[in-house]
């Protein structure tokens, strides 16, 4: 592992070519590097125009440079930034000039953010929010990530931890009295009252049913059904481009095709699967096996049938339902040819839609319904928990608080449960016992962040 005392540098903006590029340097040598390349240091936190030079005094670029002395910087260390023209040659020359300085090395993925975390500029939940913000594809993902970055969960966790410590102080005082054979109720009762309020608040957060976690990853919708009913044509309609091969021959789709949709800010991944039938071809058999597996994991399955022969898919649909599969919508396709659909599939009780994937009839209504489904199953504006790590630690915190409440007057055991609860919230914030997960979390970041 690299030393945190080393100075690091990296491109912190998009890849060239671009109008501008930002190269960031962080660490004890940042001022030396900036002065060598720009000629002098600008006033702290003020932009300065400078002609950059390499080690042989050859000019590189007319740029803007900034200087952020520690601790008032993004990482908490000395930080220099070079705002340069975003051509490949310019960037390469600036990176080369920086790299010729001693005690410098290229930054690892997420290393700037990790240094900010280690220097107390943000807690672990806020760092995770920053990672989510970088990877947000939709507006609602962006909003949720920004709330996390701004400390929505971290602030609540710090408040809870402070209340637990206050309750612990009362219990510890009661322990002192217990040594004398008397446990005063006026100490234990208010402590347990605090704990009960905290437990109710945490249980309310845990009751959010993982919707915010789901918003990070998005819903998965599988298009399933018998072969040659128009699944690939529907996939192309949803994607508004040709992503799947359309053929009159059954069994054309043999692998799984994915399309990512943004439905009113909600992320939805639609997968087109091989037609469900008893296949003879080994390749098609494997496609059917994969289709069944992925569809079983999906949040919603669109069972597509030919409106001219809707009953042909009924037995297969009921077979899936008998296996405990849920979340089905029946979609009757080819109504442009068949007219009003026939069959008894609506008797299954699942929502039914009539469309023509060929000319787009009814597809807008299907997409609108998918958007409503996503809104009903993904997080709201007040959601706090966005990762399984958050949920696990809050559940452990709540369990410890619950045990503390259930203990009668065993003050030493109550104190221990409160210590466990405070420790779990410390882990949530990244302040205790998290070294083993830091590498995993910050490795998800891009280089330069």
Swiss-Prot record:
EC class of this enzyme?
hydrolase
Q: Which GO terms describe its molecular function?
A: GTP binding; GTPase activity; metal ion binding
The principal localisation class reads: cytoplasm
CC terms in the record's Gene Ontology section: cytoplasm
The cross-references to Pfam families, in alphabetical order and at most eight, read: MMR_HSR1, MnmE_helical, TrmE_N
Q: Which residues bind (6S)-5-formyl-5,6,7,8-tetrahydrofolate?
A: 24, 81, 121, 449
* Binding positions for Mg(2+) per the UniProt entry: 232, 253
Report the InterPro entries cross-referenced here: G_TrmE, GTP-bd, GTP-bd_TrmE_N, GTPase_MnmE, MnmE_dom2, MnmE_helical, P-loop_NTPase, Small_GTP-bd
Cofactor: record remark: Binds 1 potassium ion per subunit.
- Give cofactor(s), names only: K(+)
Residues engaged in binding GTP: 228-233, 247-253, 272-275
**What EC number(s) does its UniProt record assign?**
3.6.-.-
Q: Can you cite a GO biological process for this protein? A: tRNA wobble uridine modification
Q: What Gene3D superfamilies does this protein's entry cite? A: P-loop containing nucleotide triphosphate hydrolases (3.40.50.300), Probable tRNA modification gtpase trme, domain 1 (3.30.1360.120), tRNA modification GTPase MnmE domain 2 (1.20.120.430)
Q: Please list the residue ranges annotated as the TrmE-type G domain.
A: 218-375
Q: What family does this chain come from, according to its entry?
A: Belongs to the TRAFAC class TrmE-Era-EngA-EngB-Septin-like GTPase superfamily. TrmE GTPase family.
Query: How the protein assembles, per its UniProt entry?
Result: Homodimer. Heterotetramer of two MnmE and two MnmG subunits.
User: Function, please?
Assistant: Exhibits a very high intrinsic GTPase hydrolysis rate. Involved in the addition of a carboxymethylaminomethyl (cmnm) group at the wobble position (U34) of certain tRNAs, forming tRNA-cmnm(5)s(2)U34.
Q: What's the protein called, per UniProt? A: tRNA modification GTPase MnmE
- Species of origin reads Rhodopseudomonas palustris (strain BisB18)
Starting at the broadest rank, the lineage of the source organism is:
Bacteria, Pseudomonadati, Pseudomonadota, Alphaproteobacteria, Hyphomicrobiales
């Amino acid at each position: 592992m690299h030393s945190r005392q080393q100075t690091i540098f990296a491109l912190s903006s998009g890849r060239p070519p671009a109008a501008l590029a930002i190269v960031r340097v962080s660490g004890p040598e940042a001022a030396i590097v900036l002065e060598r390349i720009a000629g002098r240091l600008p006033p702290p936190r003020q932009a300065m125009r400078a002609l950059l030079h390499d080690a042989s005094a050859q000019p590189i670029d007319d740029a803007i440079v900034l200087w952020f002395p520690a601790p008032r910087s993004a990482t908490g260390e000395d930080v220099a930034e070079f705002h340069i023209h975003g051509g490949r040659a310019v960037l390469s020359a600036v990176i080369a000039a920086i790299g010729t300085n001693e005690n410098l090395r290229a930054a690892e993925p997420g290393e700037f953010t990790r240094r900010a975390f280690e220097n107390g500029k943000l807690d672990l939940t806020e760092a995770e929010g920053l990672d989510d913000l970088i990877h947000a594809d939709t507006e609602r993902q962006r909003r949720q990530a920004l709330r996390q970055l701004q400390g929505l969960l971290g602030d609540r966790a710090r408040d809870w931890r402070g209340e637990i410590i206050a309750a612990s102080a009362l219990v510890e005082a009661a322990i002192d009295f217990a040594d004398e054979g008397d446990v005063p109720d006026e100490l234990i009762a208010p402590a347990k009252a605090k704990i009960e309020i905290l437990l109710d608040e945490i249980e309310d957060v845990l009751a959010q049913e993982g919707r915010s976690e789901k918003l990070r990853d998005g819903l998965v919708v599988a298009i399933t059904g018998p072969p040659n009913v128009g699944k690939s044509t529907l996939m192309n309609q949803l994607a508004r481009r040709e992503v799947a091969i359309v053929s009159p021959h059954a069994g054309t789709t043999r692998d799984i095709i994915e399309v990512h949709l943004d439905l009113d800010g909600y992320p939805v991944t639609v997968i087109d699967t091989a037609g469900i039938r008893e296949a003879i071809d080994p390749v098609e058999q494997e496609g059917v096996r994969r289709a069944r597996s992925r569809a079983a994991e999906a949040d919603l399955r669109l069972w597509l049938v030919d409106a001219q022969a809707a009953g042909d898919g009924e037995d297969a649909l009921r077979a899936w339902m008998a296996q405990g599969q849920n979340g089905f919508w029946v979609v009757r396709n080819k109504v442009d040819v068949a007219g009003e659909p026939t069959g008894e599939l609506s008797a299954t009780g699942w929502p039914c839609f009539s469309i023509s994937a060929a000319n787009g009839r009814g597809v807008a209504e299907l997409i609108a319904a998918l958007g409503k489904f996503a809104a009903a199953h993904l997080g709201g504006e007040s959601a706090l928990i966005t990762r399984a790590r958050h949920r696990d630690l809050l559940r452990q915190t709540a369990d410890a608080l619950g045990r503390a409440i259930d203990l009668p007057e065993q003050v030493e055991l109550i104190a221990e449960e409160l210590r466990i609860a405070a420790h779990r919230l410390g882990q949530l914030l990244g302040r205790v016992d998290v070294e083993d997960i830091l590498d995993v979390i910050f490795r998800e970041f891009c280089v330069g962040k």
